Amino acid sequence: MEVKAIHRGARISAQKTRLVADQIRGLPIERALNVLTFSPKKAAGIVKKVVESAIANAEHNEGADIDELKVKSIFVDKATSLKRFTARAKGRGNRIEKQTCHITVTLGN
């Protein structure tokens, strides 16, 4: 049995999120949540919400036992960038790209 949760358009770069995702890949649920809870990174809070959503999906949709679940796969894909402008000297402007990503978590036995 596999259960998925996806967060699309998370307002953080994929590169920063992958650092957190690599830490919990393959871990049991309880241990993964502990790692995410005590991590100081912004991405940890976002990934934790996605993992908790996947746990809720497993309980509600599949009636699964949470204690047996582990993070079967987690991957982070780059999403579209938000284009913004910032003012520069002499009336000029530079483009800023605010990165977004898609986070996909799959839980299984």
From Swiss-Prot:
Matching NCBIfam families: rplV_bact
InterPro entries, per database record: Ribosomal_uL22, Ribosomal_uL22_bac/chlpt-type, Ribosomal_uL22_bac/org-type, Ribosomal_uL22_CS, Ribosomal_uL22_sf
Keywords from the named record: Ribonucleoprotein, Ribosomal protein, RNA-binding, rRNA-binding
Membership in a protein family: Belongs to the universal ribosomal protein uL22 family.
Subunit structure: Part of the 50S ribosomal subunit.
GO cellular component, one term: cytosolic large ribosomal subunit
GO BP annotations, alphabetical order: translation
Purpose of the protein: This protein binds specifically to 23S rRNA; its binding is stimulated by other ribosomal proteins, e.g. L4, L17, and L20. It is important during the early stages of 50S assembly. It makes multiple contacts with different domains of the 23S rRNA in the assembled 50S subunit and ribosome.
SUPFAM superfamilies reported for this sequence: Ribosomal protein L22
Organism per entry: Cupriavidus necator (strain ATCC 17699 / DSM 428 / KCTC 22496 / NCIMB 10442 / H16 / Stanier 337)
Protein name in UniProt: Large ribosomal subunit protein uL22
A family per Pfam: Ribosomal_L22
Signal peptide start and end residues: none
Alphabetized GO MF terms: rRNA binding; structural constituent of ribosome
Superkingdom, natural source: Bacteria
Stored Gene3D superfamilies: Ribosomal protein L22/L17
